[in-house]
Amino acid sequence: MSAIALGMIIFAYLCGSISSAILICRLAGLPDPRQHGSGNPGATNVLRIGGRSTAAIVLICDVLKGMIPVWLAYQLYVPPFYLGITAIAACLGHIYPIFFQFKGGKGVATAFGAIAAIGWDLTGLMMGTWLLTILLSGYSSLGAIVSALIAPFYVWWFKPEFTFPVAMLCCLVLLRHHDNIQRLWRGQENRLWNKLKKKKEMTEKEKKRTEKEQRKED
């Protein structure tokens, strides 16, 4: 392993360890995503507790954590195998962040960013697969699982030299979703739309309650 490859792997892990969900929630005055919602510090949970705009910012930051290190390693001609290790290091940083007591998210967005750095054609296919699965099923976790299963085949078709590293990365994502896979199998996984609907209903109830209290005071 060259010094450049080793340096990029360390850099990728440190980038991944910056938990954008926790930091952005703090800046926005929102609850800690590790202690609310699903307990997962990721964009989907931030969507539940903070809304679309905050979740979108978290999603972009998580994608960039994987994209930037892998893109830099790609530009520095790091061999495909170590490029894959760089991508895995970024995801491991997101999953086990050194800056946040090694308690992180599931690494889906970061893995997506790492794969996107290899080619924009792969980005479109991955995004399309993820969105289509969510729209058809309503399960955010299923979108991530299906995308992780299909991604190696996309890479094999367009850039076969990166198939093995991407397959390793996707295995890591699937391992992080083992609880979701069990809940899906048992029919216990909650649909994303149902969670958002419940949140909207709770917000409306709180709003009505506040209005009633104000009327009483008047």
Swiss-Prot record:
Functional pathway: Lipid metabolism; phospholipid metabolism
Recorded GO CC terms: plasma membrane
Membrane topology classification: Multi-pass membrane protein
Annotated transmembrane regions: 4-24, 54-74, 80-100, 107-127, 130-150
One Gene Ontology MF term: acyl-phosphate glycerol-3-phosphate acyltransferase activity
Reactions listed under catalytic activity: an acyl phosphate + sn-glycerol 3-phosphate = a 1-acyl-sn-glycero-3-phosphate + phosphate
Coiled coil: none
Name the UniProt record assigns to this protein: Glycerol-3-phosphate acyltransferase
Organism encoding this protein: Photorhabdus laumondii subsp. laumondii (strain DSM 15139 / CIP 105565 / TT01) (Photorhabdus luminescens subsp. laumondii)
Lineage: Bacteria, Pseudomonadati, Pseudomonadota, Gammaproteobacteria, Enterobacterales
